[in-house]
């Protein structure tokens, strides 16, 4: 079996180590495709774990999340598989919201909200990570390829990018009891 290559160009990373340009990951295989085509799920998992733990082990996260691809990766990662990986394998506890309003409500209660959102746009679906920004805004990672500091209110993201109101979102609540 052919070994899968893994090389993330430094131009795909923000200065603080997040993956912000999925389009540059043509050399990273994911399922039967490339991370540039269908890798937003593992990229979101990496970005969230990088925020929470400082990890830079991209390849391990990519290969672990690859187990949950749909149609050999053509449709990216199964949402429940991504949750399973982050919850059971990485010890993250989440609150699930399904709408912008639910996400805003839960984020307002959190001191430093972060999480992963799956949204639908004209060309399909896309996972992004959000972490705390400045002045009560959120910083979005891998939303606009190459933008390292994309900070704005959630309603502006919905207005500019989101087609359907259903947006499954995992908002980090803390470690699971087993991981504590």
Regions found by a protein language model. Give the residues of each.
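...with weaker cross-activation on analogous glycine-rich loops/strands in unrelated enzymes
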Residues: 78-131
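Intrinsic-disorder/low-complexity loop/linker signature
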Residues: 17, 101, 123, 177-180
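Short flexible/disordered coil segments
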Residues: 67-69, 116-133, 157-164
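Noncatalytic regulatory segments and standalone regulatory/sensor domains
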Residues: 2-13, 108-111, 131-180
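Extracellular-facing segments of soluble proteins and assemblies that are Gly/Ser/Thr-biased and enriched
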Residues: 63-85
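Active-site-adjacent structural segments surrounding the nucleophilic cysteine of cysteine proteases
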Residues: 1-71
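Generic detector of well-ordered alpha-helical segments enriched in charged/polar residues
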Residues: 59-66, 83, 104, 155
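Short coil/turn linker and secondary-structure boundary residues
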Residues: 56, 77, 149-152
